[in-house]
Amino acid sequence: MPRKLPSSPKTSALQLGRAVAWPGSPEEAKLDRVPNPQKGTNYVARFTAPEFTTLCPVTGQPDFAHLVIDYVPGSWLLESKSLKLYLASFRNHGAFHEDCTVAIGKRIATAVRPKWLRIGGYWYPRGGIPIDVFWQTGTVPKGVWIPDQSVPAYRGRG
């Protein structure tokens, strides 16, 4: 039997463990955070979203990306269900690749106030050109191992 979060004012506001509606837009989406039980330890947490989708703001055509989000938590952890809902809210949102990638990184950084965060947005080609976008909050804390994001360069069929 899975362990349930104890009910408290902090946990009752979470989307985790409850049925919630998909947010209609990134602005409507809520990012939840939970206390970090290892806040005295520097470590890296990684979220990977290999099937992120959004819309081109000009043509309305779908755009696809492989997102990799690495962060060194401070006092808070990013709750993964809320991240999933937030990323899904971009499905009908129109924005350029650079704006999507940087906005996601900034929103997460604001929500959880990590010691460090980076996001890599590896966008699939539109018009024959793949676009990769990278953003981070500052320098990596000393002594923290940051693995490579391991997303190969786009090669097409060649």
Swiss-Prot record:
Instruction: Alphabetically list the UniProt keywords.
Output: Cytoplasm, NADP, Oxidoreductase, Queuosine biosynthesis
Q: Which GO terms describe its molecular function?
A: preQ1 synthase activity
Family statement drawn from the similarity comment of this UniProt entry: Belongs to the GTP cyclohydrolase I family. QueF type 1 subfamily.
Q: Which residues form the active site?
A: C56 (thioimide intermediate), D63 (proton donor)
| Name of the protein in its database record | NADPH-dependent 7-cyano-7-deazaguanine reductase
- HAMAP family (UniProt xref): QueF_type1
From which organism does this entry originate? Nitrobacter hamburgensis (strain DSM 10229 / NCIMB 13809 / X14)
The record's listing under NCBIfam families reads: QueF-II
Under Gene3D superfamilies, the record lists: 3.30.1130.10
- Positions contributing to substrate binding: L78, E79, S80, H97, E98
Q: Which InterPro entries match?
A: GTP-CH-I_C/QueF, NADPH_dep_7-cyano-7-deazaG_red, QueF, QueF_type1
List the EC numbers from the record.
Answer: 1.7.1.13
What is one GO biological process annotated to this record? tRNA modification
Q: What is its main location?
A: cytoplasm
Origin superkingdom: Bacteria
